[in-house]
Structures are given as structure tokens and as C-alpha cells.
């Protein structure tokens, strides 16, 4: 156990500045272009629904399960009071989760705790798998978890570091684009049951305020994450 813990908190040396810069560029390309974004967007959905689930548990709502769909949408099913702080916080957590996870990943990467980061991601995926209530969602989590397990068990340290960097940047950039897509749908009246509109019905604030708040947190996370992983 002591050996495993020592392995878990082993600090890797700082990456070369060009590695950080290229990792950021790679993540930005994935998020910016349609085809790679369609392929990878499901990972952001995992983080989004995971955020709802964690907050539901923290606010003592009954978590009934999570569903992930092939169109990269998802839903987290909870039971409890239909109004009140618990419901508000649960609805609020989804769009914030990818950016905050990206910020946490950026901090761990900056600290050189790459192995701890990868094992942490694997643990979160396993916990989420236990809550999945549809076959497609289970398949996606098994594939993602299998890839993460293979990375931590078989990939050399420098490869793990690059993947961790790209993943941190991807979560940070990937936390922004769904908010843009959300507002675009809202402007066309195609997202009446979005998290922002649910929050508007739960509180006195309009849905546009929550879109603004989501975007503010996402952009601040990108800025602070970039500061932490500053290649210069």
C-alpha cells in the first residue's frame, strides 16, 4: 500500500514550454472544429452530468441514475423537493462542472501530480458507471474508463503527461463551447427545458443571467488554468 501511495503522489518534472503550448493548440482544435468536437463532446457530457450527480448527493437529493445518449446529450435523474436550494444547486452544477474539473486538472498537472490525476479520473468514471441507467451510457463509460486504465498502467510517464495536459485544456475549452451552443438554442427558442431555463423557473433571475454566469465561470477557469500551466 505504501508503494502504491508513493507511486500515486510521485511528482513528475515540468514539461517543456512547447509541450504545454502544443497541447493547448491540440485541445483548441478539437473543440473548435465540427468533426472532432462531435466525436469528443460526449466527454464533456460525462463531466456535465457528473456535476449534476455530485451536487445532488451533496445536497441530499435522492440520485436515481444518469443516462448518456448517442447525440451527446444526457440527463441526471434525481428525486426530492422540486424547488429550494438543493434543486437550484443541482441544476447549476452541470455547466460549471467541465470548467471546474479542467481547473482542477490544470492545478494537478502544474504540481506534477499526473498519476494522481489519472487515477482520480478513473475513480470518478467507476463511480459514475454505477449510476448509469442505459446501455449506451454504460458502453461509453467502459470505453473511456478502459482507455484511462490502459494509460495509467502501460503508457510511459511522458505520454501520460501529454495526455493530462491535453485533457486539462480540453475540459477548459470544452466548458465554453456548450454554453455558446446553449445560448444559440435559447435564442431560437429550442431549449425551453435547458438548465438555465429551469433555473429561471426556480428563482427570480432570468435564464440569460445564468448563461452569463456559466460563461463567466468558464472564461475565468480558462484564464486561471492558462496561468497555472503557463508555458512561458
Tell where the protein language model's regions lie, with residue ranges.
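Membrane-helix interface "capping/anchor" motifs
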Residues: 36-37, 110-113, 129-141, 156-159
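Divalent metal-coordination and catalytic microenvironments
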Residues: 48-50, 94, 199
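Hydrophobic, membrane-inserted alpha-helices
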Residues: 24-27, 100-104, 121-129, 143-151
